Amino acid sequence: YLVQNGICPRVLAMDVNEGPLARAKEHIREAGLSAYIETRLSDGLSAMKWVEEAGADGGTGADGETLHGEVFRGEALRGEVLRKSRPEADTLLMAGIGGRLAARILENGAQKLFRMRTVIVQPQSELQLVRRTLNRLGYRIEAEDMVKEDGKFYTAILARNVRMAGSGEDGSSMADAVDI
């Protein structure tokens, strides 16, 4: 949907289980979107790579190995790698998982989330836990809406990184980028 409607030029689809990932890959191939959507086996955000920030002036490389396993818990980020690299995605979309799992993924991926602009999450349970986790990690909830899927209602939450509040790289407002 995101690629087909020009909302997102590139998507990284990740899942911890091979079966759902294989089915997703088949749907992507059938839709002719393999050039735009990459799939990876991943526990949370662990398979999301770090890329060198545009304009970085050398220094420590952004190979991902340097940061692997570190956990950010609200303190100031340390090290040249963190200042000169970013995760390969600027938006995280999570749907179809419970709130406890969503909160765990957010907590375990906190260092990458520190450099991402937007989180969209549709937890199937424990909304308060997800809201508190987003808040603790420096995200402000900007919108919530009910979504009906297969006869069930779910809450979709749009949250923005307060450290990057207000604009995209081109200076445009992020408010128009996602309509939940």
In which residue ranges do the predicted regions lie?
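Conserved SAM-binding loop of SAM-dependent methyltransferases across substrates and taxa
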Residues: 1-8
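Conserved acidic residues
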Residues: 9, 90-91, 117
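Conserved SAM-binding motif I beta-strand of class I
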Residues: 10-15
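Conserved SAM/SAH-binding beta-strand->alpha-helix loop
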Residues: 17-19
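S-adenosyl-L-methionine
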Residues: 25-55, 71-86
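Active-site segment flanking the S-adenosylmethionine/decSAM binding pocket
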Residues: 51-54, 85-110
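Long, compositionally biased low-complexity repeat segments characteristic
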Residues: 52-67
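Class I S-adenosyl-L-methionine
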Residues: 100-180
